[in-house]
Amino acid sequence: MGWGSRCCCPGRLDLLCVLALLGGCLLPVCRTRVYTNHWAVKIAGGFPEANRIASKYGFINIGQIGALKDYYHFYHSRTIKRSVISSRGTHSFISMEPKVEWIQQQVVKKRTKRDYDFSRAQSTYFNDPKWPSMWYMHCSDNTHPCQSDMNIEGAWKRGYTGKNIVVTILDDGIERTHPDLMQNYDALASCDVNGNDLDPMPRYDASNENKHGTRCAGEVAAAANNSHCTVGIAFNAKIGGVRMLDGDVTDMVEAKSVSFNPQHVHIYSASWGPDDDGKTVDGPAPLTRQAFENGVRMGRRGLGSVFVWASGNGGRSKDHCSCDGYTNSIYTISISSTAESGKKPWYLEECSSTLATTYSSGESYDKKIITTDLRQRCTDNHTGTSASAPMAAGIIALALEANPFLTWRDVQHVIVRTSRAGHLNANDWKTNAAGFKVSHLYGFGLMDAEAMVMEAEKWTTVPRQHVCVESTDRQIKTIRPNSAVRSIYKASGCSDNPNRHVNYLEHVVVRITITHPRRGDLAIYLTSPSGTRSQLLANRLFDHSMEGFKNWEFMTIHCWGERAAGDWVLEVYDTPSQLRNFKTPGKLKEWSLVLYGTSVQPYSPTNEFPKVERFRYSRVEDPTDDYGTEDYAGPCDPECSEVGCDGPGPDHCNDCLHYYYKLKNNTRICVSSCPPGHYHADKKRCRKCAPNCESCFGSHGDQCMSCKYGYFLNEETNSCVTHCPDGSYQDTKKNLCRKCSENCKTCTEFHNCTECRDGLSLQGSRCSVSCEDGRYFNGQDCQPCHRFCATCAGAGADGCINCTEGYFMEDGRCVQSCSISYYFDHSSENGYKSCKKCDISCLTCNGPGFKNCTSCPSGYLLDLGMCQMGAICKDGEYVDEHGHCQTCEASCAKCQGPTQEDCTTCPMTRIFDDGRCVSNCPSWKFEFENQCHPCHHTCQRCQGSGPTHCTSCGADNYGREHFLYQGECGDSCPEGHYATEGNTCLPCPDNCELCHSVHVCTRCMKGYFIAPTNHTCQKLECGQGEVQDPDYEECVPCEEGCLGCSLDDPGTCTSCAMGYYRFDHHCYKTCPEKTYSEEVECKACDSNCGSCDQNGCYWCEEGFFLLGGSCVRKCGPGFYGDQEMGECESCHRACETCTGPGHDECSSCQEGLQLLRGMCVHATKTQEEGKFWNDILRKLQPCHSSCKTCNGSATLCTSCPKGAYLLAQACVSSCPQGTWPSVRSGSCENCTEACAICSGADLCKKCQMQPGHPLFLHEGRCYSKCPEGSYAEDGICERCSSPCRTCEGNATNCHSCEGGHVLHHGVCQENCPERHVAVKGVCKHCPEMCQDCIHEKTCKECTPEFFLHDDMCHQSCPRGFYADSRHCVPCHKDCLECSGPKADDCELCLESSWVLYDGLCLEECPAGTYYEKETKECRDCHKSCLTCSSSGTCTTCQKGLIMNPRGSCMANEKCSPSEYWDEDAPGCKPCHVKCFHCMGPAEDQCQTCPMNSLLLNTTCVKDCPEGYYADEDSNRCAHCHSSCRTCEGRHSRQCHSCRPGWFQLGKECLLQCREGYYADNSTGRCERCNRSCKGCQGPRPTDCLSCDRFFFLLRSKGECHRSCPDHYYVEQSTQTCERCHPTCDQCKGKGALNCLSCVWSYHLMGGICTSDCLVGEYRVGEGEKFNCEKCHESCMECKGPGAKNCTLCPANLVLHMDDSHCLHCCNTSDPPSAQECCDCQDTTDECILRTSKVRPATEHFKTALFITSSMMLVLLLGAAVVVWKKSRGRVQPAAKAGYEKLADPNKSYSSYKSSYRESTSFEEDQVIEYRDRDYDEDDDDDIVYMGQDGTVYRKFKYGLLDDDDIDELEYDDESYSYYQ
């Protein structure tokens, strides 16, 4: 049946058929994308800018993406975590930000581990060593037949086991605790990207799903010889793991993984990729591609990271690994698999990008790979290409150990040259034109480990890689079914461009775009100019996609080594595999060639020929031999290659064996290696490194490997810098910038911090939590410091920061005096003394710097405090003070002076001891390595440096004696030892605990006593009934009746004498109470029994009754308790229960009887009210008049008339004390147990008196303690007076206060008094000398005469700070002491070598000044001097002046001081009357002025003008500081008033007010913020912009709170109160996942508030049955009716949290008085209402004038614009927000074409990226761009999209780029 007959259905079925067919075709194509709430963003400007933008649009900046600079990981908590629709909301306007260059919402990518599970039932776990069974690593005796293996043992025999090489497995984690992996595990090569931590341990489950990474790791680096399981190929390599497959795999996750620690990791092994389902086309997204590029360019210090990839397991699905962008990349080494037999495994894919192969499994019966497995086990069932890639990684590790300098391309070249076909079975083996045998199944063949290490040993780096892009014609060609399209392109290899010229090929990439109705029907081939044909794509049966290929890159390595130039032939075949619509043929739209390779032959002779040993010598110097011009016939230089030399000398080589080096005279010589400052370039040339590099791998500044002196290598950028960046320190030994500890902001060593990151404080050299002085933080709490430490950072004497009195801080330890090369620092700026290190040039010194030396090292001379290089003397000589060599003293081998104390080294026969050469070390030192070393300070003599190496002891530095015991000197001898006169501890006599000598014991051990005759210890033997006294060595009698007793207590018997009974460790003549005798012991009675025997109890304790030999509290039915007898007696036979034995004492009756007045009678005997039944008279008789009813007798009342109450069967008118009249029961009832007098059950009037347990009456009840809000007084709880919450003693003696009040000295007040602060509701006194504080230990302002520094008040500011408005402010970095913050405010310089001039610290005095030693400052010379030596002595004069004998410069020596020399009419002329000295007759030619006048430039004035002040020292008008309008001195802190635009704070003028102040425009001053504010915009508590410590900012109100109000939570990182999610009533953090309780219409479920109704509805009504009604139209979701109950707003609105109202963002053109709107400039995460601030009434008149003038100017400009617009003709319609199509795209394109530029960051093969033109930030013009289909759009910067406009912008691209 044809196509038409099958598809054309009649009628309505026609449409259904078409839809069914479309669905079937599109289903595989339209896979649902899953968008996450994570974004990748590229932002220029660093972390601060990224954080600002993230906060503005509601994102959280997780941090930089791996090693990708300027790429950040953003997370948005208020968007859906996983959605099939990309996120659209106000946060999407982040793309409009000028600094945002590119943004991409992350999409979940499916990645499959490339192992294959045959059958879980067949897996067997073994714990035995598996080496004999590891067939793929060696041929054992039981392996038959043994095929050619990978020669791994051969590499081992050559000494290579992977040592110092680091391999990381990118997978689902590795089990780092596995016994086979523990030894080689490398934490620096490991992290958990899925879990965002550093531990790569896999997630365990019942199925062991995450075993893959552990198996791969074992193949690489399982430890050898540990008797556990297997052996890794590189069993001495370091192994790490990156856990990244056990979660959502996104572009960011992959990029972070492949770029993890690239300077530490050498090889990355990955055994995963896109689905091997035969229909997927997928590869690295932009971030991962960038990470690959960065890895090969900068990883391994520029040598390039090595990426090893498994080729794929899609063989059964007819997959082709060219559709996998990871294995198809030039940056990865794609590894395939072969079975043991050499046959193709059934899972193997074919493709032209596979480089080589290793062993793995084949058929189910074939052997598989043995490796480590989860739960510390092993497996022999590892399969697939997953097993092959780690093998390759292990072999490459062996090669890198053999030659660590192999580049990433060198590794691929070595694999190409050493892999071999061997026994591998494939029908497509071919030999290319370069002589390499290659296959689509196995690449260049099976890897050979031994051959690789041998090749690596002699390898020379290949020339630089060239990239040639050959763009073919763009003519579209139609691909017909069952036919082929051929396109031929003649390539030149870019021969016209020497920087891109490719002659010898490596990788060849075809970049191709094809449209096709069924992608799986295509097959693509490429034929090289040499005739090598590569299959780039084979038919794929399951690929039904209609997408074709869009800029997809196919790669082949089959042309490796061939020439690039010539005809390249591309063939595209269309072979229909099933029926399809032939009306839509495929089209080859465009293709291009990208050729990678070198311009010269990549292999040097060293690589081509066997290595031979040759003698080398340096050839860097110029040749000095004078060669003649005749032909040279002698031997050539050893560095010439085998082609020899042609004269005239032996070094004139025809070709070099190793490298060419070009000398300064332009001649070339051959050298064995390039000299320092050069690198091995292409063509065997030595090229120069960048100027600062000592060694390098390229000529650029970011390709350094080591640096010249004075520079440090930044390991992250491979550049040489003079100063290391923040977060790193200078390693001066290795000239490196190394990273600081994670807590340091700056440091001098890894753990030696100098500045800490936020939230931590510097404790010595460590950053940790702050503790009070004398304590340190140990990670959990604050612990006391060592006794030497005043403050410390850790335990022990080495943890001191400052030392106690009598000790000095020296290099982190406390010493009693400064060591050699240290000096005592007199500054003591913090009150503690310290020893500072002398300058490196000094041996000893008395101060800092190189000018304070007091002695010098050997070979240097002391000159004016500086050590200068002396003469160079021979051994046995030294340099004397005149610089001459003199002979050392005879005992020295080398010395630094003439005496025997000046030795520096000794002869072999002598020992060096602190400058002396001695025959034996002094007694308090020991010899080690021919030097005397001091003993431990506790030893007098010793054999080593430790405290356990003493041989004798004496007194320590404090005069305390020490005693030797087992090599240690202790304060005293241990127990059982005594001290000899030689301070040695010897043992006491036997059984002696304390003694004076070996013969005299003073205390014996237990059980012994001192014999008075010989003072020895004799065993104490006590008689019967005696025991040893524990305090005295004697026998004491036991307690009476004891036969034996306890050593510790003679009263504790262990046995009793005859006639005594034992009970409770005592002996009794008769058994005590509550016991009875039984044989020789007393037995205790039962509980509550007073007397008993073995048969039972006789009587009971009070409150209990005897019943059948037992004691009971209640007797039970038929019995009552007889109080007198203490027994249970029987009731009357008629009673069920009773209170006595009588017939009328029943309380309940037997069945059939009725209770009547205490009697049980038959119903016939019931009486009338007021009468009772008389049994004797057998008739009714009247009750007593007081009874209402009675029983048995007239006076035994059972109820009473009204007004009377029943009490003990009598009626009383009032109840006695302890009872109360109950109207309900008509009887007197007992008060509660603790109550003495009451008027009701809970209406106590007086409590009982209980000695030792007082009770207090409160609101009718008795309490042992008065409740909160009351206090005890005379047995009554009285109420505290308001506003006390608790009080004591009296109503006003408060202990705590109600809300809104604070407690101060027992009184509740609204505010604390001055110099107090409220802490937890109690007023605490501020610290000493503190005027105002925010915490009891944190001062805010000091009292007069004191200054604030580090939150405390000091009498003076420490060095490096100056006093300003009672605050200590840091000086400029150049100043040691200063008077202000500027560089010209110094009073003392930081460096002692610097000089001071006009407050500036300079290296030397400037011209026109002289150095004054007394003040150590540079002073100005006289105006007439050009240079001078003092204030009145010129050394040279200004032009036109001459010097007189006194050193003064004058016009003419004949003229008087008030005259000048006239050159025109020679002679002396008088100065102007206003001048004292002058240069001419005019009044503006003065040099000095008379008294009461001041020199202003060259004019004398009475008063200085504005901007100047009178300098009385120089009698002139000097410039004020640039910030001052008027002043009293030159410094910035001597202003009287400020220039416009500056604000005055005290006497200082500032452009921006300091922290804690705000600028008041009306007064031009900096005014103090409210005490709770850190930064503010006004004086009120609601003007805060940031808060001080202990406060949190409520941004919506501008207030600082000690604790956040309801509906807010504390965000510690920003010190703010953040609003809970709109659905949360209370919460513990940001977002919808941290709720603690919910608002109405929501219920809590797992921290999330879930709506009770559908979206857009709210709940109405209580209980389980309720209704739901629609939300207000402005809300998307809500909690109630109306516009002010919203919980979620539409995309164009922002939720105002305080009133749950959805509002628009304010337009910049809206007037402040317009309707309510949100200020979205800073953030769209929360609505902050725009406020219109009222200007102060006191504003200057000039401000009002300015506003008026501005308004007039705006009106004039507005009028001009209107006139201009009218002249333009037709009015343009108002532009809608968003994008609109331009009318004529063809016309527009040319005008905007110049506005575009191509991306240089990513190749646009998978994702189309749109970029805007470059615009200035203030340019509001339309932005134009072109879409994929060529349509030109105009984009507007401001506003939101209308619903109608959105459709015009729909496109599928997931990334966007912007260049602003």
Swiss-Prot record:
Region CRM (Cys-rich motif): start-end pairs: 636-1727
Biological-process GO terms, alphabetical: anterior/posterior pattern specification; cell-cell signaling; cytokine precursor processing; embryo implantation; embryonic digestive tract development; embryonic skeletal system development; heart development; kidney development
Region feature (AC 1): 1807-1826
Disulfide bonding pattern of the chain: none
Ranges that cross the membrane: 1744-1764
Marked site positions, Cleavage: 114-115
Free-text tissue specificity from the UniProt record: Expressed in T-lymphocytes.
Name of the top EC class for this enzyme: hydrolase
Enzyme Commission number, as recorded: 3.4.21.-
Signal sequence bounds: 1-32
Alphabetical list of InterPro entries matching this protein: EGF-like_dom (IPR000742), Furin_repeat (IPR006212), Galactose-bd-like_sf (IPR008979), GF_recep_IV (IPR032778), Growth_fac_rcpt_cys_sf (IPR009030), Kexin/furin (IPR034182), P_dom (IPR002884), Peptidase_S8/S53_dom (IPR000209)
Entry annotated with the keyword Transmembrane helix: yes
Residues with glycosylation annotation: 225, 381, 665, 752, 802, 852, 1014, 1191, 1290, 1497, 1685, 1707
Keywords, sorted A to Z: Cleavage on pair of basic residues, Glycoprotein, Hydrolase, Membrane, Pregnancy, Protease, Repeat, Secreted, Serine protease, Signal, Transmembrane, Transmembrane helix, Zymogen
Cytoplasmic topological segments: 1765-1860
GO cellular component: extracellular region; extracellular space; Golgi apparatus; Golgi lumen; Golgi membrane; trans-Golgi network
Extracellular side: 115-1743
Residue ranges of domain Peptidase S8 in the record: 134-453
Active site residues per record: 171 (charge relay system), 212 (charge relay system), 386 (charge relay system)
Keyword Coiled coil: no
Membership in a protein family: Belongs to the peptidase S8 family.
PANTHER family on file: FURIN-LIKE PROTEASE 1, ISOFORMS 1_1-X_2 (PTHR42884:SF3), PROPROTEIN CONVERTASE SUBTILISIN/KEXIN-RELATED (PTHR42884)
Protein name: Proprotein convertase subtilisin/kexin type 5
Organism in which the protein naturally occurs: Homo sapiens (Human)
UniProt lineage: Eukaryota, Metazoa, Chordata, Craniata, Vertebrata
